[in-house]
């Protein structure tokens, strides 16, 4: 009888263990999903693929073994050195961040230096532009002065031309008077000497007017030379307008 009881108890235990309705695993798996810990990410298809106290659950579209206990440490993993490894990793990340920050500082300084260089170049270009503007103003001023000198010379030349014409008219009038005197002059005993004196006087006056006429022509030629010189200077100033300052 004792042997049959033992066999019956073992059969009952196996039947209960393999029953799909009741399982000892259901007693140890927590009902709150957030408390379940992924153990080694072992894939499974049923609870039997996992160890005791574990359940097969779908996480991120993958069936893995989970349970209410902390995961076992990996083989050959020194738990005491986990803190040191984390500290070393943090230290390396900190050094990398500091190196990256230093690199950014250097790039920032280089950019500031480049910006300062551009500012200096811009200031130099502005100064050159101002110098070109001053030179252009000076050339325009010289051109205006040349125009004024040319107009003054032309006015003086016109005045000399008027004086020359006036002298020529006066000379023609004296020539007419000379001819009239010569026509009226007749050899007479009492009037012959007087006529000769008047004739000499008229010739002297005519000669004086001829000298004044020659002087006026010389003065006109001098003003013509001055006008030509002013025209040449004005043309030189006009050529300066075409000068382009690099």
UniProtKB/Swiss-Prot annotation:
Keywords: Repeat, Secreted, Signal. Residues 112-123, 217-228 have a biased composition (Polar residues). Residues 1-20 form the signal peptide. Residues 88-246 are annotated as: Disordered. Sequence repeats lie at residues 83-96, 97-110, 111-124, 125-138, 139-152, 153-166, 167-180, 181-187, 188-201, 202-215, 216-229, 230-243. Residues 83-243 are annotated as: 12 X approximate tandem repeats of [AV][DE]X[VL]SGSX[DE]QX[KR]X[ST]. Disulfide bonds: none annotated. Residues 175-186 have a biased composition (Basic and acidic residues). Expressed by the venom gland. The keyword Signal applies. It comes from the Eukaryota. GO terms for cellular component: extracellular region. It is found in: Secreted. This is 33kDa venom protein. It comes from Chelonus sp. nr. curvimaculatus (Parasitic wasp).
């Amino acid at each position: 009888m004792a042997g049959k009881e033992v066999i019956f108890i073992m059969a009952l235990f196996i039947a209960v263990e393999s029953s799909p309705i009741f399982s000892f695993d259901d007693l140890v798996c927590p009902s709150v999903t957030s408390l379940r810990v992924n153990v080694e990410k072992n894939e499974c298809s049923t609870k039997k693929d996992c160890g005791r106290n574990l359940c097969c659950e779908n996480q991120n579209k993958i069936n893995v073994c989970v349970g209410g206990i902390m995961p076992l440490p990996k083989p050959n993993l020194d738990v005491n050195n986990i803190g040191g490894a984390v500290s070393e990793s943090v230290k390396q990340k900190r050094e990398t961040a500091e190196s990256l920050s230093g690199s950014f500082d250097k790039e920032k300084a280089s950019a500031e230096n480049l910006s300062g260089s551009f500012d200096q170049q811009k200031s130099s270009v502005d100064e050159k532009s101002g110098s070109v503007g001053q030179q252009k103003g000076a050339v325009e001023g010289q051109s205006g002065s040349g125009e004024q000198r040319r107009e003054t010379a032309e006015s003086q030349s016109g005045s000399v031309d008027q004086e020359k014409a006036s002298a020529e008219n006066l000379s023609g009038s004296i020539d007419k008077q000379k001819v009239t005197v010569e026509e009226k002059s007749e050899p007479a005993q009492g009037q012959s000497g007087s006529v000769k004196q008047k004739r000499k006087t008229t010739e002297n006056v005519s000669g004086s007017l001829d000298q004044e006429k020659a002087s006026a022509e010389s003065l006109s030629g001098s003003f013509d030379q001055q006008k030509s010189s002013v025209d040449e200077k004005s043309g030189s100033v006009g050529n300066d307008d075409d000068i382009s300052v690099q």
